[in-house]
A protein has these predicted regions:
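Short Gly/Thr-rich strand-loop-strand
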Residues: 88-96, 108, 118-157, 193, ...
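In a subset of proteins, long, contiguous C-terminal domains/tails are tracked
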Residues: 25, 480-481, 485-563
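One face of beta-strands
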Residues: 50-54, 99, 112-116, 143, ...
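Long compositionally biased, domain-poor regions of proteins
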Residues: 100, 349-374, 388-389, 405-412, ...
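Structural boundary/hinge residues at secondary-structure and domain interfaces
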Residues: 39-148, 183-247, 266-375, 399-413, ...
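A conserved glycine-rich beta-strand in the N-terminal activation segment of trypsin-fold
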Residues: 144-218, 441-519
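N-terminal secretory signal peptides that target proteins for export/translocation
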Residues: 1-15
């Protein structure tokens, strides 16, 4: 019987596996952001777990979500094109079941396995038979297909078909493989899970050895001992991270019900490892600066989290290595004018010492807020420090270095003390030619700095003094509400209104109308939370943002957009 898989299908599978490998590599490069999904209890038949697992949502769900997004951007015909193409290439596939890809390394080399939801794979292959190089059905029902000079083996296992480059790989797939990947496709259109500890230790060690060898050769060629020490410390941390890492997960999904594009990531370390201790030491704490979290914010960033002893130690090593590199750079002939290098280094060392003293307090607490709108831009921030008095002393010392120039900023220290915070004022004349800046800030830009025993504040913009005092007052009212470790939110509408008030634009006006009709006014949100031995990060892009992109794209035949 001559049944085979088309070359296009073989190439498609190969390209998909390559894309998955690239995604896993990119995810590994951003380990600090991590992902939430728990590892499935399901294993392969040899008791191991796949090194890499990919779950793709059902074709029906994928088509519905693509239709939703293309409708948001005002191009529903694109969703129709996708649906037609998907139907042409997925005939015979169960449209309501997810697709899975597993990569095992039981043999010491990657073995990709594709799992397709179909009850009759022979029917699918028969339709594509003419595009195969060769095909043979073996006595046990396995179908061997010649594709681009290699053989792919396909087996029917219940309601799914399994394809791999060896029969041994097919034997690794359990009778019901769906639990291996279904959780990844349940909440996302695409889910990826990387089990780092399933990579054989010799392969991990070989990778680390090659990385260290390449580093050594690069440093020998560079000849900068300061940079070498810094890079060596960073390399040690990367090596520790790779050895301690357990699981990475990535999920990309379209949530039509919530009206958002969702990206979830998570990272976990091996229980009992140094990295796990660092992750476990990060827990939400009461915050002095939580008032930045407000509904009318154009943007805010907030973090309030404990810092583990292991993280403090690692931070100290990093600061020391960077200071050594800076000292070496400033000591080079001609780096700075005579005497200036020592002075600059003195200030840098003071800042580094203050930063480390703050970290050694075992917590990080900060908040940043931007308010914007028509002819309006304000900013306020607060930051925990170990000694606000040292910050004030450093600022006063630096102020003596400001040149005697009428265009230079004017500083007024010890303006007043408000609720335990000493306020200082900075004024800067806005040149007459800067019409847009004067429209926002007036003839003089005013900024305020506040220093307290354990905090530093800053604000600028019209009305920034009142905004700063309001922010200071709010710090005493935090009731220790449990919040995420860190969170960020950006809302498009206030920035669009600001841009349009500075210089009116038809395209911006059109986007404003579109975003104004959306529920979230164009929000982008990020939340970071702790999980056992790790952390998870969720990004949400609201429907208003997607609609804004569509509104900014010129309609075919209408000409290019003004920007």
């Amino acid at each position: 019987m001559g049944i085979s898989c088309c070359r296009a299908t073989g190439t498609f599978v190969t390209q998909k596996l390559a894309a998955v490998a690239l995604m896993a590599t990119l995810t590994l490069g951003s380990l600090n952001f991590g992902l939430m999904s728990q590892a499935s209890a399901q294993t392969l038949t040899d008791g191991s777990k796949p090194v890499l697992t990919v779950g793709l949502s059902s074709m029906n769900e994928l088509k519905n979500d693509v239709n939703y997004v293309t409708g948001l951007i005002g191009r529903p015909e694109f969703g129709g094109f996708f649906g037609v193409a998907a139907m042409a290439y997925s005939q015979g596939v169960d449209q309501d079941e997810p697709i899975g890809v597993l990569v095992s390394m039981g043999s010491g080399a990657p073995e990709p396995i594709v799992i397709l939801p179909t009850a009759n794979v022979k029917q699918i292959l028969s339709r594509l038979e003419a595009q195969f190089q060769e095909m043979e059905e073996e006595e046990d029902g396995t179908i061997a297909i010649g594709v681009n000079g290699m053989t792919i083996y396909v087996q029917q296992k219940g309601k799914v078909a399994v394809a791999a480059q060896s029969k041994d790989a097919l034997a690794l797939v359990p009778k019901d493989p769906k639990p291996l990947y279904a959780d990844l496709a349940e909440k996302h259109n695409l889910g990826v899970r990387l089990q780092i500890q399933q990579i054989p230790a010799p392969i991990r060690d070989a990778f680390l050895g090659a990385m260290r060898q390449g580093f050594t050769q690069t440093m020998q060629a560079g000849g900068d001992p300061g940079a070498a020490d810094t890079a060596a410390a960073a390399l040690d941390q990367i090596e520790q991270l790779i050895k301690d890492s357990d699981q990475l997960t990535f999920g990309l999904g379209i949530d039509a019900e919530a009206g958002a594009l969702v990206i979830d990531t998570s990272y976990t370390a091996v229980a009992g490892s140094v990295t796990a201790a660092m992750q476990q030491g990060q827990r939400p704490i009461p915050s002095r600066f939580s008032a930045v979290i407000r509904d009318d914010a154009a943007a805010y960033v907030h973090q309030a989290v404990s810092i583990s002893p292991e993280s403090i130690e690692q931070a100290q090593e990093g600061v020391d290595a960077n200071l050594d590199m800076i000292r070496n750079a400033l000591s080079q002939p001609g780096a700075l004018p005579p005497g200036l290098g020592d002075e600059a280094l003195g200030y840098i060392e003071q800042v580094a010492e203050l930063a480390m003293d703050s970290i050694k307090e075992g917590k990080s607490d900060s908040g940043f807020l931007v308010l914007a709108g028509e002819d309006k831009l304000q900013f306020v921030m607060g930051l925990f420090v170990s000694d606000g008095g040292k910050v004030e002393a450093l600022a006063k010392d630096l102020a003596t270095k400001i040149p005697d120039d009428p265009r230079a900023p004017r500083l007024t220290f010890d303006l007043e003390t408000y609720n335990g915070v000493t306020l200082h004022k900075l004024e800067l004349d806005v040149p007459e030619r800067e019409d847009e800046a004067r429209k926002l800030f007036g003839e003089t830009l005013e900024a305020y700095i506040g220093t307290a025993d354990k905090a530093v504040y800053a604000s600028f913009g019209k009305g920034s003094e009142a905004l700063l005092k309001e922010f200071i007052d709010s710090g005493a009212s935090d009731a220790g509400e449990i919040r995420p470790n860190a969170q960020m939110q950006v809302t498009m509408m206030p920035f669009l209104e600001l841009a349009n008030s500075i210089e009116a634009d038809d395209v911006i006006s059109n986007v404003i109308t579109t975003v104004g009709q959306s529920a979230g006014k164009g929000k982008i949100r990020m939340v970071m939370e702790s999980i056992e031995n790790g952390s998870k990060v969720s990004f949400t892009v609201g429907a208003g943002v997607i609609q804004a992109i569509g509104a900014a794209i010129p309609t075919p035949g209408a000409g290019a957009a003004p920007f």
